[in-house]
């Protein structure tokens, strides 16, 4: 399964909202469709969002019918702004937008700028693929033979447009014949763990158990879990990390049980412009994601719902960051 593919100036994405029941690929024909796919989680995971954003901007730029920079620039800025507004938390999205904006700011010929934007999007895609492969290799070195590793949400190939970050670490350790196994949390409310991580672990042949989010502490107390590895959507300068809601709870539980808690993320997820997690904008999503399940209401009508998509794990709870440049241990 390929999450994202750029083919003949068309963006092909796998609709992740339908998995694992249906494997359906969508051909996106304009940047509005790309923006909508990001908003609705048809494409998701911080690195994949960044890649899709870059292609979406390239898409939009190719559709601008002018050869004059004075006419091209304001239309391009509208496209860039729409893509940037899709989701507020993932750093990779804004990294991609900034890189594409820089290409435009550096150009003087509209045709050449369009070509350069496509080239930059492809470059971002290849960089994320390569980064996830290196992350997986470095991270596998931390996993001891026979360990059971817990992961949360989905940080595999579907989320990274490549090999995977947190899930890539687990898969790489398995491929090294270390005899490891995994626990995957279902990840309410959108069940990325049950729908996506379970699918990827199954396809990779990794022995695993799917559990509800609230079971993690029980299995840690029983001594079943040896490490926790998660991905990230944005990492502040001090190491505070935003990731899927429920990550912070797992980090607290891991600390209480003496279990190392690792964050696997590419350098594109690190945001040096913000000092701490207090500065990270947390996306609030629709209440229907909690009150409905697969189109069926599961909660009473007319109730208040809180639905933050992410939480922030303080840096002091994280044993190490696994990046494409190596391992960064706490305090380094």
From Swiss-Prot:
It comes from the Bacteria. Its EC number is 5.3.1.23. Substrate binds at residues 44-46, 87, 192, 243-244. One of its GO terms (molecular function) is S-methyl-5-thioribose-1-phosphate isomerase activity. Keywords: Amino-acid biosynthesis, Isomerase, Methionine biosynthesis. It catalyses: 5-(methylsulfanyl)-alpha-D-ribose 1-phosphate = 5-(methylsulfanyl)-D-ribulose 1-phosphate. The record marks 153 as: Transition state stabilizer. It holds the Pfam family IF-2B. Belongs to the eIF-2B alpha/beta/delta subunits family. MtnA subfamily. The active site is at residue 233. It comes from Dehalococcoides mccartyi (strain ATCC BAA-2100 / JCM 16839 / KCTC 5957 / BAV1). Pathway: Amino-acid biosynthesis; L-methionine biosynthesis via salvage pathway; L-methionine from S-methyl-5-thio-alpha-D-ribose 1-phosphate: step 1/6. This is Methylthioribose-1-phosphate isomerase. Catalyzes the interconversion of methylthioribose-1-phosphate (MTR-1-P) into methylthioribulose-1-phosphate (MTRu-1-P). GO terms for biological process: L-methionine salvage from methylthioadenosine.
